[in-house]
């Protein structure tokens, strides 16, 4: 895989290599969020913002301290922090370990409505 990832310019910084928002990991599914973030870093992403269930935050901060960690909002809670993260991102990933329930579907609809990133 190394041959597919270009060498980095020594004068660059992590912000030069893209900002990824990952919305992943329902309660008890921290591993899915962790592996999604790890994959983003390993494929060259410079900055990762990881939004997961609040029960996962301590685990994720320990496993992948270089990521910016956010608590996933419930639909009826304040959505503003996630909206800011969506605007911040160059690209986003939604879904690993999120489940298939109505709350996940509603959150996905909001993300798709607000998102502009691929």
Question: Where do the model's predicted regions map?
Answer:
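Small-residue (G/A/S/T)-rich helix-start motifs and N-terminal tracts that mark the onset
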Residues: 1-118
